[in-house]
Swiss-Prot record:
Protein's UniProt keywords contain Amino-acid biosynthesis: no
DNA-binding region per Swiss-Prot/TrEMBL record: 207-226
Protein name: Global transcriptional regulator CodY
Keyword DNA damage: no
Localization terms from the record: Cytoplasm
Gene Ontology, cellular component aspect: cytoplasm
Length: 260
């Protein structure tokens, strides 16, 4: 049976995972599953707004309401607010506590259910909450040491993800700015007209029709599209007589056009 040191090493090894390896929809499902296996419990991770980032159900908690939390990927506002007031780990909370993960209607089904809440911090900020629970059996001191380590590890990962997202946003903005600076006034006018034709981020358009409507030549539109495509802002595909299919890859172009 793994001892505390071995379990700690398993948890800290999570930090070796690249941010790029995180899932898109529930980025911390794998992490929650790993924590659930190591600590022997159910686990979920929510951000500061109560959005579900990942969960693992090692033991079935047969309540429709808990399952609804995971299906909608959002915890109730009242619960999120109560959890946000937990500044240090609260361990072995009974089914009578407001922070129990067990809904009121399941108290008789899981009278010995226990919940542990651990705040997640990163860079001095509250980033979310780690919630673990069992249908019975208290979390031991060793378990709680692992919980503290787990919340720290998750905090570092969340902070890394925020940093990655910020860097990606800045990169995209820089690319858009550089591309816009290469466009003439007529080409900017063409780009604005083209993107207004799209249904969301993609759609079909006919360059000659747009050119006639805004009073420019078709070549201006073609040149503008080439510049945006070479910058990785859009993708285009000829549809022959039906026109051109266009898809926006870098949505920062929309914000930039608002300034035009």
């Amino acid at each position: 049976m793994p001892n505390l040191l071995e379990k700690t090493r398993k948890i800290t090894s999570i930090l070796q995972r690249s941010v790029d390896s995180l899932e898109t929809e529930l980025p911390y499902n794998t992490m929650a599953s790993r924590l659930a296996d190591i600590i022997d419990c159910n686990a979920c991770i929510i951000n500061g707004g109560g959005s579900l980032l990942g969960y693992a159900m090692k033991y079935k908690t047969n309540t429709d309401r808990v399952e609804e939390f995971f299906e909608t990927r959002q915890f109730p506002d009242a619960y999120v607010k109560a959890a946000s007031r937990v500044y240090d780990t609260e361990a072995n909370l009974s089914v009578e506590n407001e922070l129990t993960i067990f809904p009121i209607e399941s108290k008789d089904i899981y009278p010995d259910g226990l919940t542990t809440i651990a705040p997640i911090y990163g860079g001095g900020m509250r980033l979310g909450t780690l919630i673990i629970w069992r249908n019975d059996n208290e979390f031991s001191d060793d378990d709680l040491v692992l919980v503290e380590i787990s919340s720290t590890v998750v905090g570092i990962q969340l902070l890394n993800l925020q940093t990655e997202n910020l860097e990606e946003t800045i990169r995209k903005q820089t690319v858009v700015n550089m591309a816009i600076n290469t466009l003439s006034y007529s080409e900017m006018k063409a780009v604005a007209a083209i993107l207004s034709e799209l249904d969301g981020n993609e759609g079909r358009l006919t360059a000659s029709v747009i050119a006639d409507r805004i009073g420019i030549t078709r070549s201006v539109i073609v040149n503008a599209l080439r510049k945006l495509e070479s910058a990785g802002i859009i993708e285009s595909r000829s549809l022959g007589m039906k026109g051109t299919y266009l898809k926006v890859i870098n949505e920062g172009i929309f914000d930039k056009l608002k300034e035009f």
